[in-house]
């Protein structure tokens, strides 16, 4: 178990304190699947609303809120799903809803914790490409925790390998070799390489 900090703040300190500049995409989506997509996307703004505003958004989002959600969904290729029940979407679509939820926060830093672990290879590549496109277009900092070395090699320009809380590699994916992978992954090396 590790800790992450940003802008001089320990990410574990002051639980409950809202770090508005940070957006998090979780491995398990963390969506309320019984709700419509629009409500899950707008949940990214809950921290900036009053209790009454939050309840109003849940009952009937205002036109401006719907437009915010529509724009975020358009950025991830799901504009037509704004009123869909989230449970009716595929795993890849649900992960895109989770990304849209982060986009409405407009964070400067996006932390993605194994964002494609539960997805098939094609969908995983599509989701990573979406994240990277949004990072480039929006000037965001993107930090992705991912263990699939094949996906890392195909999609990222920089890799930082950690073992026991210390950096053991910081370089280009092309420079990852068997020795470095053995240092990073130990006994799980084959699983990480094959995905």
Question: Over which residues does each language-model region extend?
Answer:
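Conserved ABC ATPase signature
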Residues: 85-89, 93
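Conserved catalytic motifs of ABC-family nucleotide-binding domains
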Residues: 106
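Conserved ABC ATPase "signature" region
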Residues: 49-80
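H-loop/switch region of ABC-family ATPase nucleotide-binding domains
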Residues: 146-147
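Helical segment within the ABC ATPase nucleotide-binding domain
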Residues: 125-137
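Catalytic Walker B motif of ABC-type/P-loop ATPase nucleotide-binding domains
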Residues: 110-113
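Helix N-cap at the start of a conserved alpha-helix in ABC-type nucleotide-binding domains
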Residues: 121-123
């Amino acid at each position: 178990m590790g800790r992450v900090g940003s802008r001089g703040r320990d990410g574990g300190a002051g639980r409950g304190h809202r770090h508005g500049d940070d957006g998090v995409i979780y491995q398990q989506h963390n969506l309320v699947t019984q709700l419509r997509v629009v409500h899950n996307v707008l949940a990214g703004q809950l921290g900036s609303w009053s209790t009454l505003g939050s309840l109003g958004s849940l009952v009937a989002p205002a036109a401006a809120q719907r437009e915010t959600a529509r724009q975020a969904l358009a950025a991830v290729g799901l504009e037509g799903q704004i009123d869909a029940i989230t449970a009716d979407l595929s795993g890849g679509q649900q992960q895109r809803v989770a990304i849209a939820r982060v986009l409405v926060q407009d964070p400067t830093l996006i932390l993605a914790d194994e964002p494609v672990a539960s997805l098939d290879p094609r969908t995983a590549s599509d989701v990573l490409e979406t994240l990277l496109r949004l990072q480039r277009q929006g000037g965001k900092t993107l930090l992705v925790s991912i263990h699939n070395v094949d996906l890392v090699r195909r999609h990222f320009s920089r890799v930082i390998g950690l073992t026991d809380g210390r950096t053991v590699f910081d370089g280009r994916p092309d420079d990852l070799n068997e020795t470095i992978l053995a240092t990073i992954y130990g006994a799980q090396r084959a699983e990480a390489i094959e995905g």
